[in-house]
Amino acid sequence: MSDTETPGEHPVGIDTLLDRIRTTYARVEPQDAYDATRAGDALLVDIRYAALRDRDGLIPGALVVERNELEWRLDPQGSHRAPEATGHDLRVIVVCNEGYASSLAAASLHQLGLHRATDLVGGFQAWRAAGLPVTR
């Protein structure tokens, strides 16, 4: 056992980790995410790198937060929270490029008490492929 392992736990690969995480909440399809944000029922949070946003465009109305700042910006108790981080009952839909990093990010938000956090199946690429709004 390594110094970082918990007794009784075994290391897992990223695919297994994602599978485990994704069983703890319902992920959202692009059209459902669009409808929820238009209705004011969810906050869409784009965690893609600036280079990807520059290359592919932005989702109108999405809060852009770099992945390495996500927890600090969305923690309702944090001193660096975004104005949109209104409480632990906030429904957050995290968007990355293809829907992988966003699953890990949503799980991290759950640990902060944002239990309605989820992510977008297929990420930004699925959003764009569905013909949903993108700005340059």
Q: What does each model-found stretch correspond to?
A:
Residues 1-42, 50-91, 100-136:
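Rhodanese-like catalytic fold shared by cysteine-dependent sulfurtransferases
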Residues 45:
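Active-site flanking residues adjacent to catalytic metal/cofactor-binding acidic residues
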